[in-house]
Structure formats: structure tokens, C-alpha cells
């Protein structure tokens, strides 16, 4: 066996049009089987990015044409200052929230819609779901995760949001079958999903 080191090419950006902010790298209320995050044994670890760091990132990129700010993490909505961060980012551009949807309920969605309406920009939701079968999905994400995502989708649609589903084909199933089954579920909850990443 030969050891080798490969260097990836450096690409010069002509402009910065997307800004990714990882609000937390360790705080999540799910323990998905496929997750890359090495969660600490101590569940009290708080590794939230500071609001000042986010302000600095927004200031440092003020001359860039940012089209979207992506709030990621483990679970970004666990950040204690999430609402303030969202408002701050919405002053600058569209905001996309990558979430497992466990913090999304009708009360939260009403609040988020009000925040979006106060802004010139849009909030985009990317919701994680890994299987069309409740038992298989919850085997990956934890009990109740499947129903929570469906509830979140319904609440978001009710208030005019159009969530994007992020699906991991954990069981390596036929993609066409997977998509057909998800389409059937989406129809049942009156969510008209389009597929553009398969």
C-alpha cells in the first residue's frame, strides 16, 4: 500500500454569494445514524457561535453580493439566540435554515412568518427526513422524528412557506421507488414536492 498526499486545487472566488454559518457543531437533539458529528458524551457541552462573531462575519462581507445566508449546525435552532441571529441575517439576504424540524410547531411558524414579513428577504427551510416509512425513518433519527417532520411541513405550508426536503438514502434503496413513495406521502398532506437533485 502506498501513502499519498493529494492537494486540492485552490479556486479563486470572483464573488462571495453564499455565506454558511454553523451556529453549533455539537448541539443537536437527535443522534442520526449517518451523522458525521462526533457528539460529546457530556450532553451539557455548549459550543454555540457568538452573536458577535456572526456580526463580524456580516460586517466583513458587507461589500459582497450575498444571495443567501445558510444557518447550519448540528441543529441550528438549539442556539439560544437563534431568533436574534435570524433577524440580523434577514437584514442582509435570504436565509436558509437546515433543520431536523423538531423545533418547528405552529406557534414558532407564526413567529417566523411575522419575522419574514418584517424583512425584504425570504426564509427558506430545508427539513431532514430519511425514509418514507415511519419505522425506518425513526430507526435512523429517533422516535417521533417522522411525525414531527410531517407536522412541520403542514405548519410551514399553512403559513405560506415552501419547505425543501433533504433525504438521505440510508438504506440504499432504488431512487425511483424512494421518490415515488415520498411523492405519495407529500400528496396525502397536500404538499406538492418537486424533485431536482436526483
Tell where the protein language model's regions lie, with residue ranges.
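A detector for short, charged/polar N-terminal pre-domain segments
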Residues: 3-11
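Canonical Radical SAM [4Fe-4S] cluster-binding loop centered on the CxxxCxxC motif
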Residues: 10-52
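Short, well-ordered amphipathic alpha-helices
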Residues: 19, 108-115, 182-187
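Canonical radical SAM enzyme core domain
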Residues: 42-56, 74-118, 125, 129-135, ...
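A short, N-terminal amphipathic alpha-helix
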Residues: 56-64
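Generic structural signal for hydrophobic
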Residues: 61, 89, 112, 153-156
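Conserved C-terminal portion of the radical SAM core fold
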Residues: 64-70, 96, 119-129, 147-198
